[in-house]
């Protein structure tokens, strides 16, 4: 009798392992830092993570699948922008780690087109979110913390490069 592998289970285990490796590579040894992407989040969330050191719940596999789709879309967009920059002689920052030690914030900005002084953050969304943003009766108001996150990265950029940003954009893409 031929045994049948459980493809979904194998994929879910792979996603969990990949997420764990990603977390370790980015955040291990940096636990004392607040995250740029957590700007504007509930103070209780910050307290439990940074003061009480409560370990968060495991991420649901459905969320891991959405994260993976977002990673793939981010990767494609970033690769296309790097190609654009290469062909046009443009300077670009992609997935750049930033640190603001005076406020203990660390994060990773998505894209800066340096010559244009333009900062972009790419947000993928699921079908439900997309329908709310772009459907028949759209509500284009993004969560406030998206803007605060982008403002944090903008603060770093202006401090680091001494240039005022001319454009700060959140680009929402259906994943």
PLM-predicted stretches and their roles:
Residues 1-119, 126-137, 143-144:
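Metal-dependent nuclease catalytic cores that hydrolyze phosphodiester bonds in DNA/RNA
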Residues 75-83, 138-172:
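Metal-dependent nuclease catalytic cores in nucleic-acid-processing enzymes
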Residues 123-124, 169-175:
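Short, structured patches in soluble enzyme cores that scaffold and shape functional sites
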């Amino acid at each position: 009798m031929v045994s049948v592998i459980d493809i979904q289970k194998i994929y879910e285990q792979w996603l969990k392992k990949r997420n764990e490796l990603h977390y370790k590579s980015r955040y291990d040894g940096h636990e004392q830092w607040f995250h740029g992407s957590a700007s504007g989040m509930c103070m209780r969330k910050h307290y439990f993570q940074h003061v009480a050191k409560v370990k968060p719940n495991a991420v649901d596999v459905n969320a891991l699948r959405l994260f993976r789709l977002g990673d793939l879309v981010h990767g494609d967009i970033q690769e296309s922008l790097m190609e654009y920059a290469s062909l046009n002689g443009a300077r670009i920052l992609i997935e750049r780690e930033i640190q603001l030690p005076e406020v203990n914030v660390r994060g990773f900005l998505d894209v800066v087109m340096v010559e244009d002084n333009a900062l972009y953050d790419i947000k993928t969304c699921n079908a439900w979110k997309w329908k709310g943003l772009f459907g028949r009766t759209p509500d284009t108001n993004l969560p406030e913390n998206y803007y605060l996150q982008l403002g944090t990265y903008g603060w770093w950029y202006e401090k680091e490069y001494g240039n005022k940003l001319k454009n700060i954009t959140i680009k929402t893409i259906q994943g």
